[in-house]
C-alpha cells in the first residue's frame, strides 16, 4: 500500500506510515495483497483488514513475519530489517549509539496478528480443531485453542476453562473478539524454577519483575518496593499517556514549520517560473547572438533553484522524519492502550520510554532557517541591464553610421583567441551594423621569447577615462579618426628577430612564458565566451561618454560615500605607491613559513574560477570608495557617490546593499579564488571591517576558497621588469594607459596580464594562494600596525602562522613578562634584514600597548594609544579560527 498524505484527515490513515518530503502519490487499493487464506470473507472482513493495515511491514507492505520495533518506532519484518543496515529504511534515522539491540520484538503486533488470524478462521467457517483437525465448534480463551465437540468434552473434564461456541463468536465484531481475548490474558511469575506457571498479582519494582506470593516472601531485600501489579501497569500506562500529550505540543510546532517549508518550496517554484517566463520574453526581443546569454541566465536560475531547493528539501526531510516518529509513537501508544495485554505493556515499556524521551528532546527551532525566495532578483537585474544595453546599442549603431567620428571611437577590449571565432564574431557584428575600423596596438611575438609591444600609443577607452577632462576626450576622438592597423599577433623568424628587437624597446623586460598569447582585442563585439566592459557611472565632474553596445554583462552599483577626496589625493597616492614599491614586493613575496590550506591543494582547485578583485580607499575617510571584480565572463563594479547625488543617480544604494550585491556576485560562482594585486595592504582589512559591520563576513568566507597574491606571481613570471607598478606593467605588456584611480581598470589589467602570462587556477598557484584565516588574522592585527607598535611585514608573518590580535593579548595577559617572547621565533627570517639596533619584534612597545589596553580604554586614549575596539570582532573571529 502506498504511503498516505502526511496530514490527511481520513480516519483510516496511519500516522506511522512512511511519507515523502513532497506530495506523495494517492493511496492504492489494498485488495490482492491480503494474506488471509479465505477466498470469500464476510462483509466485516474488509473493514477489519483496512483497520489493521498497521500490522503490515511499513517497508514492503507485506504481512510482517516476526515484526521488529525500531528505535524510531517504525515496524519492519525481519527480512527488511536485515537489508536495512544500520538505519531505518523509512526515515533514515540511525540506530542510537550504545543500544543493546537495534530492534525489539514487537510482541504486541505478533499477538494481535495471531488473534486476528483466529478470528478470520472463525468468521470464514473454516476453523479446524487444534488437536484432531476436525471441524471446530468451540474456542478456549485460556488455552487459545480451537476445539471440536469431542475434544471440548475432554478439555472441560480436566481443565474447566472458559470456552465459547464459534457460532456465538461469529456474531461478534473484531473489536469485541479482541477485547475478550485481551482480558483473559494472565501474568505469571517470572521465576523459571516453577514447574507449572504460577499466576501472580505482585510486582517488584526493585527487580522489575512480576512475582508470585512465595517468591515475594522469599525476596526480603525489596519488601518496600512491592506493589500490586495492576497499579504498576496503570502507572506505566499513565506515564506513556503523559508523554504522548507532551508530544502533541511538539507535533503542533513541527507541523507549523513543516507547513512553512512547504509554502516556501511552492513560493520558490513560482518565483522560478516567473523568472524563467520573464527571461524568455525579454530574450525574444534581442538578436540571435544574445541567445547564448539567455541559456546562461536560465542555467544560473536553475542552479540557484537547485541549490535553494536542496537545502529546503533536506530540512523538509528532517521535519518529515521527526513528524513521522512523533505520530508513530502516539499511534503505537494508543493501540497498545486498546489492544496490548498487560505482559506486552511490561515488556515494551522501557523501550518505548527511551524512544519517546529521545523524541521529546527534538527541537523544531534548530531546524528553522531564513527562507529566501528573493534570490532571483539579481538575475532580473542582469536581464534588465542586458536588454537595455542591447537596445541602446542598436540606436547607437544607427548614429555611428551617420557620424564617422563616433564610429571611429575605440571600443572596449575583448578576447577572441581563435581565428574562426574572430570571423564568426565579425560576421555577427556586420549583421548588426556595428563593424567599423578601430585603431589597434600591434603586438608581435618572438620565437623562444615573450610577446612585447612593437609600438604603443594612448588608447583611452570609456572604461579607463575617469581622470580625463572634456578637452582630452575631444583630442582623443580626433586622434582616433586616423587609420591605424589592426592588432596583429605574429610569430617572428630568427632572421627578423634582431631587426624587430631594434624597433621595439630593447630595455623592456619580457614575461617568462614561451608561448605567444593574444592580449585583449580592442575592437569587435562581445562574444559569448569573452567578457565585455560596461559603462561606469561617474561623478558630475567627470564628463565622459558611456560605452556603447558592448556593455551588456556588467552590473553597476553606486554606493553611498564620498569620492571627492580621491580626486584631491590622487597625486599623493601615486607618490606613496612609488616610494613603497620595494617594500610592497618584500611584503607580498611568497612565504615558505605558512601552512597551506587543504582546500587550496585540492585537485579540484582547477574548477574554482579566478576573480580579480581590487578596491580603493579614501585617504581622508578611510572608507571604501571603489570596488571592482572581474572573471572570464562577467564583471562587477561599485562606484562611490555622495549621498547628495542619490536623487540624481537612480542606481545609488547604501554601502550595505552594495556589499550584498558583491556577495551575490561571488555566490554565483563555485567558491572562487580572489586575486588581489597588493594582498597585504590596507584594503582587505577595511573590506573585512565593512563586512563585519553588517554581519556578513561569514557569508564572504563561505563564498570564497582563498586569496591569490598577484604581485609576487607576476614578479616570478617577469623577473626582469624595471617596475612592478600595475600601471607600468599594463603600459609595457598590454599597450594600455591604465588609470590608477579606477578599480575596474586595475582588475582588467590584472586579468589581461594573467592571460598573457598563462596564469590559470591549479596546484601550480598553491604557493601564492592564502587561506581566509591568514588574512583575517592580518586584519585583526591592524590596530597594532596603526599604533606603530608592529610593522606591517611582521604582522604578515604572524598572520601566516594564524596569530591574531586576541591571541597576542591573551598571551600577554597570562604572562606579562615573557608571554610574547615565544612569537619571536615566527619572525626569525625578518631579523637578518633589520639593523642590529632595531629588534625584530619590539616586545617592549607591544607590551606597553597591551598594558595600556588592559588598564582601561580611557587611560589608553589619554596616553595616545589607540584602542582597537573596532577590530575586536575580527580579532575574536580570527582567534577562534586559528
Curated annotation (Swiss-Prot):
Q: What is the effect of changing residue 150 to R?
A: Loss of 2 sumoylations
* Modified sites of kind Phosphoserine: 8, 36, 38, 48, 117, 403, 493, 504-505, 512, 518, 527, 530, 565
Q: What is its main location?
A: nucleus
| BP GO annotations | apoptotic process; branching involved in mammary gland duct morphogenesis; cell fate commitment; cellular response to interleukin-4; cellular response to leukemia inhibitory factor; cellular senescence; chromatin remodeling; circadian regulation of gene expression
Instruction: Copy the pathway line from the protein's UniProt record.
Output: Protein modification; protein sumoylation
For this chain, the site of the Glycyl lysine isopeptide (Lys-Gly) (interchain with G-Cter in ubiquitin) cross-link is: 380, 400-401, 476
The UniProt feature for the cross-link Glycyl lysine isopeptide (Lys-Gly) (interchain with G-Cter in /SUMO5) gives its location as 380
Q: How is it modified after translation?
A: Ubiquitinated; mediated by RNF4, RNF111, UHRF1, UBE3A/E6AP, BCR(KLHL20) E3 ubiquitin ligase complex E3 ligase complex, SIAH1 or SIAH2 and leading to subsequent proteasomal degradation. Ubiquitination by BCR(KLHL20) E3 ubiquitin ligase complex E3 ligase complex requires CDK1/2-mediated phosphorylation at Ser-518 which in turn is recognized by prolyl-isopeptidase PIN1 and PIN1-catalyzed isomerization further potentiates PML interaction with KLHL20. 'Lys-6'-, 'Lys-11'-, 'Lys-48'- and 'Lys-63'-linked polyubiquitination by RNF4 is polysumoylation-dependent.
Swiss-Prot/TrEMBL induction comment: By interferons alpha, beta and gamma. Up-regulated by IRF3 and p53/TP53.
Q: Where does Zn(2+) 1 bind?
A: 57, 60, 77, 80
Covalent cross-link site, Glycyl lysine isopeptide (Lys-Gly) (interchain with G-Cter in SUMO1): 65, 160, 490, 497
How the protein assembles, per its UniProt entry? Key component of PML bodies. PML bodies are formed by the interaction of PML homodimers (via SUMO-binding motif) with sumoylated PML, leading to the assembly of higher oligomers. Several types of PML bodies have been observed. PML bodies can form hollow spheres that can sequester target proteins inside. Interacts (via SUMO-binding motif) with sumoylated proteins. Interacts (via C-terminus) with p53/TP53. Recruits p53/TP53 and CHEK2 into PML bodies, which promotes p53/TP53 phosphorylation at 'Ser-20' and prevents its proteasomal degradation.
Using the UniProt entry, name the condition the protein is associated with. Answer: A chromosomal aberration involving PML may be a cause of acute promyelocytic leukemia (APL). Translocation t(15;17)(q21;q21) with RARA. The PML breakpoints (type A and type B) lie on either side of an alternatively spliced exon.
What does the domain comment read?
The coiled-coil domain mediates a strong homo/multidimerization activity essential for core assembly of PML-NBs. Interacts with PKM via its coiled-coil domain.
- UniProt-recorded name of the protein: Protein PML
Q: What is the lineage of its organism?
A: Eukaryota, Metazoa, Chordata, Craniata, Vertebrata
Amino acid at each position: 500500500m502506498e504511503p498516505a498524505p502526511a496530514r490527511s484527515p481520513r480516519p483510516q490513515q496511519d500516522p506511522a506510515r512512511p511519507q515523502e518530503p513532497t506530495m506523495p502519490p494517492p493511496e492504492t487499493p489494498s485488495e490482492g495483497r491480503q494474506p488471509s487464506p479465505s477466498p470469500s470473507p464476510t462483509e466485516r472482513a474488509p473493514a477489519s483488514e483496512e483497520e489493521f493495515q498497521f500490522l503490515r511491514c511499513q517497508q514492503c507492505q507485506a504481512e510482517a513475519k516476526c515484526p521488529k520495533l525500531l528505535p524510531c518506532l517504525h515496524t519492519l519484518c525481519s527480512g527488511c530489517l536485515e537489508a536495512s543496515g544500520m538505519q531505518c529504511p523509512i526515515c533514515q534515522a540511525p540506530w542510537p549509539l550504545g543500544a543493546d539491540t537495534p530492534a525489539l520484538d514487537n510482541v504486541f503486533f505478533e499477538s494481535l496478528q495471531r488473534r486476528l488470524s483466529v478470528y478470520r478462521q472463525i468468521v470464514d467457517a473454516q476453523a479446524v480443531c487444534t488437536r484432531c483437525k476436525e471441524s471446530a465448534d468451540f474456542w478456549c480463551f485460556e488455552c487459545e485453542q480451537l476445539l471440536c465437540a469431542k475434544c471440548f468434552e475432554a478439555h472441560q473434564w480436566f481443565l474447566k476453562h472458559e470456552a465459547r461456541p464459534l457460532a456465538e463468536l461469529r456474531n461478534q465484531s473484531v473489536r469485541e473478539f479482541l477485547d475478550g481475548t485481551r482480558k483473559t490474558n494472565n501474568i505469571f511469575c517470572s521465576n523459571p524454577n516453577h514447574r507449572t506457571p504460577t499466576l501472580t498479582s505482585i510486582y517488584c519494582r526493585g527487580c522489575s519483575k512480576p512475582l508470585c506470593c512465595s517468591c515475594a516472601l522469599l525476596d526480603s531485600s525489596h519488601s518496600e518496593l512491592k506493589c500490586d501489579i495492576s497499579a504498576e501497569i496503570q502507572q506505566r500506562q499513565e506515564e506513556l499517556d503523559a508523554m504522548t500529550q507532551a508530544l502533541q505540543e511538539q507535533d503542533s510546532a513541527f507541523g507549523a514549520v513543516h507547513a512553512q517549508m512547504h509554502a516556501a518550496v511552492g513560493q520558490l517554484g513560482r518565483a522560478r517560473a516567473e523568472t524563467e517566463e520573464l527571461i524568455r520574453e525579454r530574450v525574444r526581443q534581442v538578436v540571435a547572438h544574445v541567445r547564448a546569454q539567455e541559456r546562461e541566465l536560465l542555467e544560473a536560475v536553475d542552479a540557484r533553484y537547485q541549490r535553494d531547493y536542496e537545502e529546503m528539501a533536506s530540512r523538509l526531510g528532517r521535519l518529515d522524519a521527526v513528524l513521522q516518529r512523533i505520530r508513530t509513537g502516539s499511534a503505537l501508544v494508543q493501540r497498545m492502550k486498546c489492544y496490548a495485554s498487560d505482559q506486552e505493556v511490561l515488556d515494551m515499556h522501557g523501550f518505548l520510554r527511551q524512544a519517546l524521551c529521545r523524541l521529546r528532546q527534538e527541537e523544531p527551532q534548530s531546524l528553522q532557517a531564513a527562507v529566501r525566495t528573493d534570490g532571483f532578483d539579481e538575475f532580473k537585474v542582469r536581464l534588465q541591464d542586458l536588454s537595455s544595453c542591447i537596445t541602446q546599442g542598436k540606436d547607437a549603431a544607427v548614429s555611428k553610421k551617420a557620424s564617422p567620428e563616433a564610429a571611429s571611437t575605440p571600443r572596449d577590449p575583448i578576447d577572441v583567441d581563435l581565428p574562426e571565432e574572430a570571423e564568426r564574431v565579425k560576421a555577427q557584428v556586420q549583421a548588426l551594423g556595428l563593424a567599423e575600423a578601430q585603431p589597434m596596438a600591434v603586438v608581435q611575438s618572438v620565437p623562444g621569447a615573450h610577446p612585447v609591444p612593437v609600438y604603443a600609443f594612448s588608447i583611452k577607452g570609456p572604461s579607463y577615462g575617469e581622470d580625463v577632462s572634456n578637452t582630452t576626450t575631444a583630442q582623443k576622438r580626433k586622434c582616433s579618426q586616423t587609420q591605424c592597423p589592426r592588432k596583429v599577433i605574429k610569430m617572428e623568424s630568427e632572421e627578423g628577430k634582431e631587426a624587430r628587437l631594434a624597433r621595439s624597446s630593447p630595455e623592456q623586460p619580457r614575461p617568462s612564458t614561451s608561448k605567444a598569447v593574444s592580449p585583449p582585442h580592442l575592437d569587435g563585439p562581445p562574444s559569448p565566451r569573452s567578457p565585455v566592459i560596461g559603462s561606469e557611472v561617474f561623478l558630475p565632474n567627470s564628463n565622459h561618454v558611456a560605452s556603447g553596445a558592448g556593455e551588456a554583462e556588467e552590473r553597476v552599483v553606486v554606493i553611498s560615500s564620498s569620492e571627492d577626496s580621491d580626486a584631491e589625493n590622487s597625486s599623493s597616492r601615486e607618490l606613496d605607491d612609488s616610494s613603497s614599491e620595494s617594500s610592497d614586493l618584500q611584503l607580498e613575496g611568497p612565504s615558505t613559513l605558512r601552512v597551506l590550506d587543504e582546500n587550496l591543494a585540492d585537485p579540484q582547485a582547477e574548477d574554482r574560477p579566478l576573480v580579480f578583485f581590487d578596491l580603493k580607499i579614501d585617504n581622508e575617510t578611510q572608507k571604501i570608495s571603489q570596488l571592482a571584480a572581474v572573471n572570464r565572463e562577467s564583471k562587477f563594479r561599485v562606484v562611490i557617490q555622495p549621498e547628495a547625488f542619490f536623487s540624481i543617480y537612480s542606481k545609488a544604494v547604501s554601502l550595505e546593499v552594495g556589499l550584498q550585491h558583491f556577495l551575490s556576485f561571488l555566490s554565483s560562482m563555485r567558491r572562487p579564488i580572489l586575486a588581489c594585486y597588493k594582498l597585504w595592504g590596507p584594503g582587505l582589512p577595511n573590506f573585512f571591517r565593512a563586512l563585519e559591520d553588517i554581519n556578513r563576513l561569514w557569508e564572504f568566507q563561505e563564498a570564497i576558497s582563498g586569496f591569490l597574491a598577484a604581485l609576487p606571481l607576476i614578479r616570478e613570471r617577469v623577473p626582469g621588469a624595471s617596475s612592478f607598478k600595475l600601471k607600468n606593467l599594463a603600459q609595457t605588456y598590454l599597450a594600455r594607459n591604465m588609470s590608477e584611480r579606477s578599480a575596474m581598470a586595475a582588475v582588467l589589467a590584472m586579468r589581461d596580464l594573467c592571460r598573457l602570462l598563462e596564469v590559470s587556477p591549479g596546484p601550480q598557484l598553491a604557493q601564492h594562494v592564502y587561506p581566509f584565516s591568514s588574512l583575517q588574522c592580518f586584519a585583526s592585527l591592524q590596530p597594532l600596525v596603526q599604533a606603530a607598535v608592529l610593522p606591517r611585514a611582521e604582522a604578515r608573518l604572524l598572520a601566516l602562522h594564524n596569530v591574531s590580535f586576541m591571541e597576542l593579548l591573551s598571551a600577554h595577559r597570562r604572562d606579562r613578562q615573557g608571554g610574547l617572547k615565544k612569537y619571536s621565533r615566527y619572525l626569525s627570517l625578518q631579523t637578518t634584514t633589520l639593523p642590529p639596533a632595531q629588534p625584530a619584534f619590539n616586545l617592549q612597545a607591544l607590551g606597553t600597548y597591551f598594558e595600556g589596553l588592559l588598564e582601561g580604554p580611557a587611560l589608553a586614549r589619554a596616553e595616545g594609544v589607540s584602542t582597537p575596539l573596532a577590530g575586536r570582532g575580527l580579532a575574536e573571529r580570527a582567534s577562534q579560527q586559528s
